[in-house]
């Protein structure tokens, strides 16, 4: 048998150096050190692969490897120790001098076969110790797996919140630069209004940043509470089988179920409030042109890769939810400055912007980020998001009426304006494109 070929290892070779318990799902790193899989992932307080070995501190340049052989040895040794315990004289039935090979689930004790037939235990549920151990371990592992999946989801929320905080800081910094650029084009200069606008932006940024950090702390707290229950389950699963069987785990299992059902914090969605720029719409209206959207093309939309968009033939059916009819202007622009407005009131989803003129004349051509310059509003569950051609979300208040589009061909950029509030939504960087572009828009109620 396989067990006969495996030598009984020393105690220290079965012990995880992190939890100091017997290995559960042992894995080893390139340096050769071995740990419980979950202990390794929880080592840095984040459920992710550590940057270095907890024992020798060598960098972890690759994923760990599951040690199947050691896992088998752990099982065999635990089973062997259980049998040694049951065969020992001190643990035999005092009354009948027989081995206690039967487990009473009601009393949570080990019995010999004669005691199990006694009147005291006649109405109780009995099973062999092998079956009892298997069932107890299966239930423990089931609870552990449920919490582990929950922990991974919560860790994703933690990482998402941290990414959002970093992007928020970057977004506010970029927006401050754009606002300075916009005010610099106003005539006469509005230095005082610009400074007030930037001060308001920074104040809102700091307030939101504090809320983001509180949100992250709440999610981390919830994750840590789950981790505590998980580690209790893990500690119990590492107990010798004979001790595990007689433990009353009802309270631990109850807390595990409650922890798995607690609503997880979803994190916050930050938004910059629209701030009016004096004279903005008046200045832009000096470049106003009338755009006729008379033609239409077909867009094939890939929800997995939102900007993998294809031009389709006019006869293509619109039955598919991934296919949309998009209106575009009769004229393209390569020189000058132009401003127009698109009424998007009441639309749940819309896209407005410009795209390279040669691209529109193609057939079955995939859009790349260098072909199209847009602002897109999407409904994401219970909130709206604004994104640009690179698929990056912008944490800006959604406009509720007309959206103004300012195209500067010499500067090579396009800007979007909330007309009702005379505020800047966002602006592409100067030099983004140097080619003929054509206006387009798409809007849908659903």
UniProtKB/Swiss-Prot annotation:
Annotated positions binding Zn(2+): 93, 96, 115, 121
Keyword Heme in record: no
First and last residues of each zinc finger (B box-type): 88-129
Recorded superkingdom: Eukaryota
Residue ranges constituting the B30.2/SPRY domain according to the UniProt record: 271-446
GO molecular function term, any single one: zinc ion binding
UniProt record similarity statement: Belongs to the TRIM/RBCC family.
Protein name, UniProt field: Tripartite motif-containing protein 43C
Organism encoding this protein: Mus musculus
Lineage start: Eukaryota, Metazoa, Chordata, Craniata, Vertebrata
Gene encoding the protein: Trim43c
């Amino acid at each position: 048998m396989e067990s006969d070929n495996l030598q009984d290892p020393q105690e220290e070779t079965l012990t995880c150096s992190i939890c100091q318990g017997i290995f559960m799902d042992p894995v080893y790193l390139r340096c050769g050190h071995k740990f419980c899989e979950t202990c390794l992932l929880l080592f840095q307080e984040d459920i992710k692969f550590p940057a270095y070995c907890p024992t020798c501190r060598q960098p972890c340049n690759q994923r760990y490897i599951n040690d199947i052989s050691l896992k088998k040895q752990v099982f065999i040794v635990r089973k062997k120790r259980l049998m040694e315990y049951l065969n020992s004289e001190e643990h035999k039935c005092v009354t009948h001098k027989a081995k206690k090979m039967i487990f009473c689930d009601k009393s949570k004790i080990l019995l010999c076969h004669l005691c199990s037939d006694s009147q005291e235990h006649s109405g109780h549920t009995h099973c062999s110790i092998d079956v009892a151990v298997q069932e107890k371990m299966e239930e423990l592992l089931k609870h552990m797996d449920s919490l582990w999946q929950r922990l991974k989801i919560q860790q994703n929320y933690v990482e998402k919140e941290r990414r959002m905080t970093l992007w928020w800081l970057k977004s506010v910094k970029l927006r401050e630069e754009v606002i300075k650029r916009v005010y610099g084009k106003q005539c006469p200069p509005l230095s005082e209004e610009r400074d007030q606008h930037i001060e308001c932006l920074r104040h809102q940024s700091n307030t939101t940043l504090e809320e983001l950090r509180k949100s992250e702390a709440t999610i981390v707290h919830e994750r840590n509470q789950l981790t505590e229950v998980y580690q209790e389950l893990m500690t119990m699963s590492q107990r010798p089988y004979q001790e595990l069987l007689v433990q009353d785990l009802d309270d631990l299992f109850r807390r595990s179920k409650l922890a798995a059902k607690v609503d997880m914090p979803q994190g916050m969605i930050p938004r910059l409030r629209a701030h009016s720029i004096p004279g903005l719409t008046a200045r832009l209206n000096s470049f106003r042109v009338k755009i006729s959207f008379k033609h239409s093309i077909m867009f094939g939309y890939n929800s997995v890769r939102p900007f993998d968009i294809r031009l389709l033939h006019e006869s293509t059916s619109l039955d598919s939810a991934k296919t949309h009819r998009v209106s575009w202007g009769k004229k393209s622009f390569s020189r000058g400055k132009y401003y127009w407005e698109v009424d998007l009131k009441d639309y749940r989803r819309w896209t407005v912007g410009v795209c390279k003129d040669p691209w529109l004349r193609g057939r079955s051509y995939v859009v790349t980020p260098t072909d199209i310059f847009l602002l897109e509003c999407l409904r994401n569950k219970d909130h709206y998001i604004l994104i640009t051609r690179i698929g990056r979300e912008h944490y800006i208040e959604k406009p509720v009426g007309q959206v103004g589009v300012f195209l500067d061909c010499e500067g090579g950029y396009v800007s979007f304006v909330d007309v009702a509030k005379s505020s800047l939504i966002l602006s592409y960087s100067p030099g983004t494109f140097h080619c003929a572009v054509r206006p387009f828009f798409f809007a849908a109620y659903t």
